[in-house]
Amino acid sequence: MKRIKNFSFVFLITSFLFLILDFIIGERFLKKIGLIYIEELIRVSNDQYEYSFEKNLNVDYAVWGDQYYKLCTDNRGFKFNCFDEEKKTYEIAIIGDSFTEGIGLPFEKTFVGMLKSKKNLDLVNLGVASYSPHIYLKKIKYLISKKIIKFNHIIVAVDLSDLEDDW
């Protein structure tokens, strides 16, 4: 009976340690080789305007639902196409929620990316999923006051769900 208890104890401890090591090492390994990029690493909190994208991302496997997509951000955390040079001044800034961000899509397939390439417009995408009018205002004020970015025009892409996000 004592052998069974000892075996059970050793088995439980070994299983527990294996699961912990598998979780820690496995997740780190997958992140390192770019096969997993969880939302907590992509979307980060921001003291000035709630949250934003992590800066300087270039990942092939950002996840939205069951889809993987390429995501690149610049040194300010703005979604962009990975190839453009970062600029300080733009003709038009577009801010909004998931539709503006183009969640689940690489930059080139978002409406901002298509306007930029097809119409040759000088645009920057400030959109992030679940943003609301309150966050739009905070982000725009912060970016302007700290001289992080300049733009001549802003398009605020508001949708009906944005109002709920502020409650």
Language-model-detected regions and their locations in the chain:
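Positively charged n-region of N-terminal signal peptides that target proteins for export
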Residues: 1-5
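Residue-level preference for short coil/turn positions at secondary-structure junctions
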Residues: 13, 87-88, 119, 150
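Interaction-surface signature
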Residues: 26-55, 133-167
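A conserved hydrophobic secondary-structure block that centers on an alpha-helix together
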Residues: 116, 121-138, 144-145
